[in-house]
Amino acid sequence: MRRLFLAWMNSLTAVELGVVFCGFFFVISLIGIALVHPHMRRVVHGQRQVNDVVIFVAANYGLLYAILLGLMVVATFQITKDLQDHVAMEASSLATMYRSTDAYPEPLRSELRAQLRDYTHYVIDKDWPAHRQMRVLAGGDHRLQAIRQKLFSFEPKTPSQEEIHREMLRYFNAMIAAREQRLSAVFSSIPDVLWYALWIGALVTIVFLWMLHLDLVPQIVFGGITAVFLGVMIFLIYAMDHPLQRAVSVGPDPIQSVYDLEMKWEDTNPKATTVSLGTGELKGVYYPVGLAICDIVNRDINKHGVRCSAEGTPGSVYNLDAIRDGELEFGIVQSDVAHAAYKGEGAYADKPFPELRSVLALYPELITIMVREGSPIHGIADLAGRRVNVGRLGSGAFATWSTIETALGWKNEEKTQITDLGPVAASNALCAGEIDASLLVVGHPSDTVRTQLSACAANFVAVSGPEIDALVSSAPYLRKASIPGALYGLTADTPTIGTNAVVMTSESENAKAVAAFAQATIAQISNLRTKHPALANLTVEEMTGGSFPAPLHPAASQVYEDLGLLK
């Protein structure tokens, strides 16, 4: 009988449950007043001190009981709030894991995505209905065990894959921890002894209302108000107790949102063409910019049937080689590196890439060299013979520094002692005095640059001089620029040179995929600007009308021509 009654109570909406509690106490109050009021008039007739004693005891008791009610409401609210936070953490970790699968090679990428979608379906369709019946199912554990086996069987082959894999495992553990908190809440409730205290205390309060000697109408009004207050407070406690079962319960909404925003399109578009966009280091600019571009492209998947997957890579040189080898369909590349590959110059003299094609231009990238405060290095000529980090082999910065060093005409003994550290390791090495300077080719403002400047009060090095002027004059893909000091709390701008970040592909790339990139980014440019500070000043003219390092892909050219953007 008790189980049926609780099941009926749990089936009520919050409004219905509130009405039941308030109505119960209100009716009890009225019945008691109707029965007791005539007798109390005879008892206290001519004995005012009896009524005074009742009021005094009721006031003190009521204060203590009100404190108990308040504490119980706060406690149950905190339990519900904590559970909401755990569910949000589970959803956030799930979303990050799903996006991070882009960094994994096929077929592991598709297998992980399918397993994560299956887990999400199970949580929404199986776990939560079971929670409402105070049951915990084992299916979620089985699915997580399968995902764990997939993750631990993977061996990263690049530094970017290693970093993403480490983050993937961290978020996987965070999701498991949040899930365990959710499961423990299935059986979380207020102890029965406290419920007995609440109900007995409420009934004693009602009895005190019956014993007051007032005129009938004021006593009914006062008793009704007090009864409704008791009903509301106990309703709140009851509704938030068992936070996965009752009226004010925690639902799977955050996880449902992850499915709708991140996964649903893949269930509804199983035949969508998936293309990979090579980006850069996770701590750099290319990776978040690549995620932003893919997010824009994937919004129109129902229209063009193309899914974009952003992959972390060492950078420009790696992206070009991967496009050539067919491992990537698209890549974000420095225009100077792309130009050298297309023309067969510099590092590409023995391996030209005449099939390389441009898709769209992005933002200017400036050569940014940082040194510790107090360093004697002020200009690029001062770097001769110094220890300089120029980024990982395969990055655009590495290739750009080779071009600059050649233009400077240094002898062998004057050339820099280069290192190939990633952004975080380079920052630590600079602050520790293990290197003299750190070079980046990056769009501004940059979080990596900001972190380095604040880590050990670093300064910028000017990239200027006759040799640099001659280099810019001979290279159409380079231009003079300056790093705005105001972006980093500095008083002066620093002269430098720059290039552009460009999305590149191969001449043989699927025209539908190229057109999807071009159409989506142009149509959503206002949204794209909000995705990363480096994209904030992006214009259609710069994206389509600039000097490309290689000819436009025919599909991109056709899109821009149809939009009237090509002159």
Write out the residue ranges for each language-model feature.
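Alpha-helical transmembrane anchor segments
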Residues: A7-R41, S184-T268
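Transmembrane signal-anchor/signal-peptide helices with a preference for the extracytoplasmic
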Residues: I67-A88, D241
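Structured inter-helical modules in multipass membrane proteins
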Residues: T96-F187
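N-terminal (or domain-start) structured segment
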Residues: P270-Q334, A340, A349
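Bilobed "Venus flytrap"/periplasmic-binding protein-like clamshell domains
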Residues: A272-D300, V306, E365-A432, S526, ...
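Pocket-lining segment of extracytoplasmic ligand-binding domains
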Residues: S335-V337, E345-A347, S375, N412-K512
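A structural signal for short loop-to-beta-strand junctions that line the ligand-binding cleft
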Residues: D350-L362, I367, A486-T494
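Segments of small-molecule ligand-sensing domains
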Residues: Y488, D493-K567
